[in-house]
Curated annotation (Swiss-Prot):
The active site is at S103 (phosphoserine intermediate). It catalyses: alpha-D-glucosamine 1-phosphate = D-glucosamine 6-phosphate. GO terms for cellular component: cytosol. It comes from the Bacteria. The modification Phosphoserine is found at S103. SUPFAM superfamilies: Phosphoglucomutase, C-terminal domain, Phosphoglucomutase, first 3 domains. This is Phosphoglucosamine mutase. The lineage of its organism: Bacteria, Pseudomonadati, Pseudomonadota, Alphaproteobacteria, Rhodobacterales. Its EC number is 5.4.2.10. PROSITE patterns: PGM_PMM. Mg(2+) binds at S103, D242, D244, D246. It comes from Paracoccus denitrificans (strain Pd 1222). The keyword NAD does not apply. The gene is glmM.
Length: 447
């Protein structure tokens, strides 16, 4: 069963443009209601969270209309991080959770992603079935069975309390000055609250959302803002979250940025030493640096690679019983604590290491020397397929032959935008640059 609406992380697009319209959100809500309703006529429960985009109000109301029309009761959480929706779906015994967010994308985009009753994102098959219902006739509930909607005032507070329980109970953050950049997004209140309540001196950044400024020069895709604040305030470290707080970058006291690979390396080594790393493996995507793989091998650990997307990381982790995984982009998945990437809880794990190690953040973040990596994006026309062109495949083959096992080449389509991502790694930076530029030129010509 194919999927056209759903990408690698739910349904996403420009607000008020297909598929991110009120009409489509209403149909998605109704289709999800039909898909998740158990047998019988009893009402069922849905939790809906959102980030701080202006279009979130429109999509929230449309989804609510669709869901209640099929007999689902809707609990509205307001602005909360994506991982909070996963957690609250499970803790509130909901049949489905929905997050309205386009994550790290600009404010003019938005998205809708679904969580099952276990708090995990839906499988490809489940999304395809919902999509099939969207395309057909959706039978509404009888008038007496229409659902209700209710705002939940303490949804954020429940998540804050849960997040604190993931930090070692015998430790406090007193004496640590921490910058936290919330990207004017979903964690703009939750993240500073958690850090302050654990004892840190908190320097908040990106905590004034206005509906239009989410991810605007801030957050995990712009960690330089957090780095400047760390240096300006003489902070011990910085935390740079994205718009829905499922990604994080760490900034050390020198203003140096550690990506998801470095964070995962630290946690894997630390957990392995503590006997907590299940299966002796870390799950990451094909985008993770070759240096991470070599770092793990040097410690008798394995790197299990998946397709790009934290959902695929989670699927591998659940299928094989691993408890640590993530992406270079900053999704850190710890299934002992969360059902999806959780930037705040990952930060707390880093802070726990910082607190009990007696080291500075700069000593913790540089776990391995990355192999030089270069990534470039090439936009292509909708409907075009540059990767199918013989000229592009020939250029990729030439690049692989030139690297001759000393590096790697990865070319893929983005799952959320009409982009071809051209990535390569090589010890020789001149060769690396030439290889990527040659492939980019071939893709641009075919696009």
């Amino acid at each position: 069963m194919s999927r056209k609406l759903f990408g690698t992380d739910g349904v996403r697009g420009r607000a008020n443009t297909h598929p991110m319209t009120a009409e489509m959100a209403l149909r998605l809500g109704a289709a999800a209601g039909r898909y998740f309703r158990r047998s019988g006529e009893d009402h069922h429960r849905v939790v809906i969270g959102k980030d701080t985009r202006l279009s979130g109000y429109m999509l929230e109301n449309a989804l609510t209309a669709g869901l209640t029309s099929t007999g689902m009761n809707v609990l509205l959480l307001g602005p909360v991080p994506t991982p909070a929706v996963g957690y609250l779906t499970r803790s509130m015994r909901a049949d489905v959770g929905i997050m309205i967010s386009a994550s790290h994308n600009p404010a003019h985009d938005n998205g809708i992603k679904f969580f099952g009753p276990d708090g995990f994102k839906l499988s490809d098959e489940a999304e395809a079935r919902i999509e099939a219902i969207v395309a057909g006739e959706i039978i509404p509930a009888q008038p007496q069975n229409i659902g209700r909607a209710k705002r939940i005032d303490d949804g954020r507070g429940r998540y804050v309390e849960y997040a604190k329980t993931t930090f070692p109970s015998g430790q406090r953050l007193e004496g640590l000055k921490v910058v936290v950049d919330c990207a004017n997004g979903a964690a703009y209140r939750a993240a500073p609250d958690v850090l302050w309540e654990l004892g840190a001196e908190v320097i908040p950044l990106g905590v004034s959302p206005n509906g239009h400024n989410i991810n605007d020069g801030l957050g995990s895709t712009h960690p330089e803002a957090c780095a400047r604040a760390v240096l300006e305030h003489g902070a011990d470290m910085g935390i740079s979250l994205d718009g829905d707080a499922d990604r994080v970058m760490i900034v050390d006291e020198k203003g140096q940025v550690a990506d998801g690979d470095q964070i995962m390396a630290l946690l894997a080594a630390r957990w392995a030493a503590q006997g907590r790393l299940r299966g002796g493996a870390l799950v990451a995507t094909v985008m993770s640096n070759l240096g991470l793989e070599r770092f793990l091998q040097g410690r008798g650990l394995r790197l299990e690679r998946t397709a790009v997307g934290d959902r695929y990381v989670v699927e591998r982790m659940r299928g094989a019983g691993f408890n640590l995984g993530g992406e270079q982009s900053g999704h850190i998945v710890m299934t002992d604590y969360a059902t999806t990437g959780d930037g705040l809880i990952a930060s707390l794990q880093f802070l726990a290491a910082l607190s009990d190690s007696g080291q500075r953040a700069s000593e913790l973040v540089a776990q391995f020397e990355p192999v030089p990596q270069l990534l470039k994006n090439v936009r292509y026309a909708v409907g075009a397929d540059p990767l199918s062109k013989d000229s592009v495949q020939a250029e990729i083959a030439r690049a692989e032959a030139r690297l001759n096992g000393s590096g790697r080449v990865l070319i893929r389509k983005s799952g959320t935008e009409p982009l071809i991502r051209v990535m390569a790694e090589a010890e020789d930076e001149t060769v690396l640059r030439e290889v990527v530029e040659d492939i980019v030129a071939a893709v641009e010509k075919a696009a």
